[in-house]
Design a protein with these regions (language model features):
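Helix-biased detector of long, well-ordered alpha-helical tracts
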Residues: 1-225
Length: 225
């Protein structure tokens, strides 16, 4: 369980408390000391950097399907495997990454929006973005968590979608994730090295989903090509 994952991440659990509830809950408050010259920030990408995603999306939609008893075992197992896979390998190559954030409650679009700064914009290709198997089928059937709908409503003014992107696909991009992957901003100089390293280390393929550009009207452009 949680203790196993903390041990894998070399984290000590000190204290804690339990609550009584109909729905199981588990969370951690993280404290520690770090070297300030090793910090990866979410607002420091550079123009022409590639945007990398290290895990497929879809855990919010799938966990909503689980609550409605609409999720098959294979999809459930895939989601659990993804959520219990740690994002620890990135620390080994942090000096080759310009910016980094995890994809969690604000969905890919929300966290990518936070990375856009200093007149930088993100251009991503929907067709390059990986999803857990069965996510699209569930989304087409309107199995969308409230948080994902709220995400899209909040960020939509900062995003321009290609006219071919359907509404359910927008929800998939805004899907609130639990233990999602990382969004990385990497220069052309290091892109091949970073992708090769992560794909050799991780069970999920790291994919390039777009680039950071500049001087556009919106923070994010979602294309179909």
């Amino acid at each position: 369980g949680g203790q196993d994952k903390c041990s894998q991440a070399k984290i000590n659990i000190l204290g804690g408390h339990s609550i009584k509830d109909d729905v199981p809950k588990y969370g951690l408050a993280v404290t520690g000391i770090i070297k300030t010259n090793n910090i990866l920030r979410n607002n420091t990408p550079k123009e022409n950097d590639s945007i990398l995603l290290t895990k497929p999306l879809g855990t919010g939609i799938i966990t909503t399907a689980i609550k409605k008893d609409l999720c098959n075992k294979a999809t459930l197992d895939n989601a659990i495997n993804l959520m219990t896979t740690l994002n620890i390998d990135i620390s080994s190559i942090s000096n080759k990454i310009n910016a980094c954030t995890d994809v969690t409650g604000y969905g890919l679009l929300g966290h990518l929006n936070e990375m856009c700064n200093n007149n930088l914009n993100a251009r991503i290709n929907y067709n390059l973005i990986p999803f857990i198997d069965n996510t699209e089928t569930l989304a087409k059937n309107n199995i969308i968590p409230g948080g994902s709908k709220n995400n899209l409503n909040y960020y939509k003014s900062s995003i321009e979608f290609d006219s071919s992107i359907k509404k359910y696909q927008k929800f998939m991009l805004a899907d609130a994730q639990t233990s999602g992957g990382l969004l990385l901003s990497v220069s052309n100089k290091y892109i091949n090295e970073v992708v090769t390293f992560l794909n050799n280390q991780n069970k999920y393929e790291t994919v390039i989903i777009g680039k950071f550009t500049s001087n556009q009207d919106k923070n994010i452009f979602v294309t179909n090509e």
